[in-house]
């Protein structure tokens, strides 16, 4: 308990130094500079971890740290902005950045794999056609040549003029196959298809190398832009109206002062007001916040469906090629029989018989697809888990953004409190008389109305406890 109290006191003292404007004294200046340097170091460190390409060297990181320190020491807006950036990483800006990163992982991973499987299928088909061209033409022609030579061997040489003329005859058979024509056609077709595939694969690889950097830069830009718009609306001419639905501790104190001065007060809120306005701190979302939570998760669900669609197309192509390859492996080969028939005196006899086997698909030409599920969906699972956590914490982070902004700009916070207080009073003045009487009757049923001594005793005990603590 003592460690928790000491840690809380240290944090509150550092927070007061960071939020308060710079004091003229040297000691206060050194404390202010130290806190700003610590925040700058944490900010640059997190940026280096999240986007190592953005600060690739120690010199760049050191220069960024020095610039951040100077900005934090000199500008209250910069100190508020950098804290709001961290909180915005858990809101819609951070959600959009994570969705962009997940979309890049899915598209670049699965599309590249689809192109790889298509290329493997094309290579397998051309390889098999080339192999079948040789395995069909040459065995047939070889057997045909053997048959011709066998017939030539059966021929009876001429015996006319043997004593005058000597016969020296030979049989020369030339082999010609149109396979080179098929080879040229295959090369032309393969070249045309592969040129398109290689171009698309090269484009995919370039996008894959640059995509992570561009998406990280786009996500960081979205966070910075969203934070800048929030500060602009909060500090703008109508800033007291922007997201002014939170009942803060300062609002409660203001309402208590109004009560002590016998002026109209708004606390406690009625049932309808509790549905619309949020009492800080609270972990139970209002109906409006639950609606915003649904809107927060809607883009996540839409992009998740798109990611699953890309993965399904990739997986179906993988299963198709894999099943076809498995069927090709299980197909039996063809046995080709060559028979030479001879006719003699009206009867046909088989005078030469030979056979050879031809496989339907060459084993070394079977395509081997791949489906790298872990390389894509492991980081996607981490991104989805972070998105779910951010969605559940979005209402709390929004409350923290309002509290941080109010700490840096107390004058704006006073205007917001006065506006919200007047708005509630104006709305209640338009309520029917019966509703006012019902609220009054509820107030009359409270015990401190009839026994104000109990309220005074409780207040005295709280004052004594606060005095002992101080």
UniProtKB/Swiss-Prot annotation:
Secretion signal span: none
TM stretches of this protein: 35-55, 58-78, 98-118, 210-230, 293-313, 377-397
Localization: Cell membrane; Endoplasmic reticulum membrane; Endoplasmic reticulum-Golgi intermediate compartment membrane; Endosome
Short name of one Pfam family: DC_STAMP
Induction pattern: Expression is down-regulated by dexamethasone and up-regulated by IL4/interleukin-4 in macrophages. Down-regulated in CD40L-activated dendritic cells.
Bilayer topology: Multi-pass membrane protein
Protein origin, superkingdom: Eukaryota
A cellular-component GO term for this protein: endoplasmic reticulum-Golgi intermediate compartment membrane
Mod. after translation: Glycosylated.
Coiled coil: none
Tissues expressed in: Preferentially expressed by dendritic cells (DCs). Detected in both immature and mature DCs. Highly expressed in lymph nodes, lung, kidney and liver. Expressed at lower levels in pancreas, bone marrow, spleen, leukocytes, in freshly isolated peripheral blood mononuclear cells (PBMC) and B-cells. Not expressed in freshly isolated monocytes.
Stretches in topological domain Extracellular: 56-57, 119-209, 314-376
Cytoplasmic topological domain: 1-34, 79-97, 231-292, 398-470
PANTHER family given in the database record: DENDRITIC CELL-SPECIFIC TRANSMEMBRANE PROTEIN (PTHR21041:SF2)
Subunit structure of this chain's protein: Monomer. Homodimer. Isoform 1 interacts (via the C-terminus cytoplasmic tail) with OS9 isoform 1 (via the C-terminus tail); the interaction induces DCSTAMP redistribution to the endoplasmic reticulum-Golgi intermediate compartment. Isoform 1 interacts (via the C-terminus cytoplasmic tail) with OS9 isoform 2 (via the C-terminus tail). Interacts with CREB3.
This protein's domain notes: Several domains are necessary for interacting with OS9. The region in the cytoplasmic tail that is necessary for interaction with OS9, is also required for its transport.
Designated name of the protein: Dendritic cell-specific transmembrane protein
Originating species: Homo sapiens (Human)
Gene: DCSTAMP
């Amino acid at each position: 308990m003592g460690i928790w109290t000491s840690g809380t006191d240290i944090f509150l003292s550092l927070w007061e130094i960071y939020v308060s404007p710079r004091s003229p004294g040297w000691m206060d200046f050194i404390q202010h500079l130290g806190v700003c340097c610590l925040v700058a170091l944490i900010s640059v460190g997190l940026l280096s971890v999240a986007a190592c390409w953005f600060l690739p060297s120690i010199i760049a990181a050191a220069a960024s740290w020095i610039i951040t320190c100077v900005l934090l020491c000199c500008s209250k807006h910069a100190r508020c902005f950098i804290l709001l950036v961290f909180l915005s990483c858990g809101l819609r800006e951070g959600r959009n950045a994570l969705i962009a990163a997940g979309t890049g992982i899915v598209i670049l991973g699965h599309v590249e794999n689809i192109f790889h499987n298509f290329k493997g299928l094309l290579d397998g088909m051309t390889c098999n056609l080339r192999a079948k061209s040789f395995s069909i033409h040459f065995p047939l022609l070889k057997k045909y040549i053997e048959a011709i030579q066998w017939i030539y061997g059966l021929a009876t040489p001429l015996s006319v003029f043997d004593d005058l003329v000597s016969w020296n005859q030979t049989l020369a058979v030339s082999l010609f196959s149109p396979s080179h024509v098929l080879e040229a056609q295959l090369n032309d077709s393969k070249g045309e298809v592969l040129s398109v595939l290689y171009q698309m694969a090269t484009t995919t690889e370039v996008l894959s190398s640059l995509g992570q950097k561009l998406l990280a830069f786009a996500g960081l830009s979205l966070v910075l832009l969203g934070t800048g718009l929030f500060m602009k609306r909060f500090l703008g001419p109508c800033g007291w109206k922007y997201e002014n639905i939170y009942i803060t501790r300062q609002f409660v104190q203001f309402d208590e002062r109004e009560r002590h001065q016998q002026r109209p007060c708004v606390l406690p809120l009625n049932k309808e007001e509790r549905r619309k306005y949020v009492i800080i701190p609270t972990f139970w979302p209002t109906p409006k916040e639950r609606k915003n939570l649904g809107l927060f998760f809607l883009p996540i669900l839409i992009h998740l469906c798109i990611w699953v669609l890309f993965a399904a197309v990739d997986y179906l192509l993988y299963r198709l090629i894999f099943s076809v390859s498995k069927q090709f492996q299980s197909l039996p080969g063809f046995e080709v029989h060559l028979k030479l028939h001879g006719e003699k005196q009206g009867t046909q006899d088989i005078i030469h018989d030979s056979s050879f086997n031809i496989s339907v698909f060459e084993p070394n030409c079977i395509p081997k697809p791949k489906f790298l599920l872990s390389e894509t969906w492991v980081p996607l699972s981490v991104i989805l888990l972070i998105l779910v956590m951010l969605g559940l914490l979005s209402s709390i982070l929004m409350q923290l953004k309002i509290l941080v902004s109010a700490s840096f700009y107390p004058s704006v916070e006073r205007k917001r409190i006065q506006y919200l207080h007047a708005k509630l009073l104006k709305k209640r003045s338009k309520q029917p008389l019966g509703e006012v009487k019902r609220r009054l009757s509820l107030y009359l049923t409270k015990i401190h109305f009839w026994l104000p001594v109990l309220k005074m005793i409780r207040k005295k005990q709280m004052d004594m406890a606060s005095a002992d603590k101080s």
